[in-house]
Design a protein with these regions (language model features):
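Conserved donor-binding/catalytic core segment of Leloir-type glycosyltransferases
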Residues: 170-188, 194-201, 206-208
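Short hydrophobic beta-strand element within catalytic cores of glycosyltransferases
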Residues: 277-281
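Membrane-proximal helix-turn-helix segments that form the acceptor-binding/catalytic region
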Residues: 108, 113-137, 145
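Nucleotide-activated donor-binding/catalytic signature segment of Leloir-type glycosyltransferases, i.e.
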Residues: 218-240
Length: 348
């Protein structure tokens, strides 16, 4: 089949969504399909652009190309999953969360005012109207499925996929640090983790790894570390190679991943692939679909004090690190998350 994957792109920004699209594209080609990624630009600031992008998505026609008829369209991201096609399935990474669970919070530029409520209504109405055009609706995680049902009363099916380079992660000898990988972003809550180090009673270090979405967020984090006099407790890795990333995972005592209501979270799967236990929070969303409290990680309240307690538990017990790390890898194997399964379901 000739298949197009519709998604959005913010120039010079690359994260989990871009990796997913590329890996799905590769998996489809490996299965003998002709597949292309079709990206449209997207910005949600100024707010008027949101409605403009919705309208633009509806004006595209992907029924045919110069290479002939397009057999299947797989919609991945808002508002690209609105692009019309007679044979479309949606595999939603997430909806425009600023209009839903993040509305009128510090994590969204949509506020409870006239403009914010108008744009929110436009987004919700568009989802209610256009998502139903798809023959089947999938999401990348049960957390996304539950949100879609809660806010739109739209049924969908969770479909898990492997993280990039999952087979390349490995287990090494533990060194005296706990790793917090993620791009530097307010929803990933690095500042909360840094604050937790004020309450840690061990000498174990926190390694923070990830590029920042903006210079402002990076500088704010570094200033916070300096202000709290935590330079001896925290080490920051801005840009690392893939090999360096694998090494940092391999030698960590555990992985700290405490995002706010994450959709899916590659970090969790990466930790499991590297035979590492995960510290996550009760409001972290996606990771809770993989972490079993007390078996392959710890699920704690999202307070600096509780995070510090979990941090210190792993810091002081090598046996706990090894046992939970082993259980983590076994749990991942048991879940049988493969691209072959994803392709089979999306193209059936």
């Amino acid at each position: 089949m000739k298949i197009v994957l519709t998604t959005v792109q913010a120039p010079f920004v690359k994260g989990g969504a871009e990796f997913l699209a590329q890996n799905l594209n590769n998996a489809l080609i490996k299965q003998g399909h002709e597949s292309e990624i079709v990206s449209i630009p997207f910005m949600d600031s100024p707010l008027d652009l949101i409605e403009d992008h919705i309208v633009a998505a509806r004006l595209f026609d992907l029924t045919n190309s110069w290479a002939g008829k397009i057999d299947l369209c797989i919609g991945l991201k808002f508002p690209a999953y609105y692009i019309p096609h007679p044979n479309k399935v949606v595999w939603a990474l997430h909806q425009h969360r600023g209009a839903y669970d993040l509305f009128d919070t510090e994590y969204s530029n949509l506020k409870n005012d006239v403009v914010g409520n108008d744009i929110r209504k436009i987004v919700i109405n568009a989802d209610n109207k256009y998502l139903h055009e798809a023959k089947r609706i999938y999401t990348i995680a049960d957390n996304v499925t539950k949100r879609m049902e809660k806010y739109n009363n739209i049924k969908s099916t969770p479909l898990y996929h492997p993280c990039p380079d999952m087979e390349k992660f490995y287990e090494g000898d533990n060194e005296d640090y706990i790793l917090m990988p993620s791009r530097i972003n307010i929803t990933k809550r690095q500042l909360l983790a840094i604050e937790a180090m004020l309450y840690s009673k061990t000498k174990t270090k926190l390694y923070v790894m990830g590029k920042s979405d903006t210079e402002y967020e990076r500088d704010r984090m570094l200033d916070f570390i300096k202000e709290k006099k935590l330079k001896d407790k925290i080490k920051y890795f801005d840009s690392v190679s893939q090999e360096e990333k694998f090494q940092l995972y391999a030698h960590a005592k555990a992985i700290l991943f405490i995002p706010l209501d994450e959709d899916y979270g590659y970090i969790t799967l990466e930790a499991m692939a590297a035979s590492k236990a995960i510290i996550t929070a009760k409001d972290s969303g996606g990771p809770l679909e993989f972490v079993i409290d007390g078996k392959n990680g710890l699920i704690v309240d999202s307070t600096p004090q509780e995070i510090a307690k979990a941090f210190d538990e792993f810091a002081t017990s090598e046996m706990m690190c090894k046992k939970m790390g082993k259980d983590s890898k076994e749990h991942l194997i048991d879940m049988e998350i493969t691209w072959d399964k994803v392709v089979k379901e999306l193209t059936r």
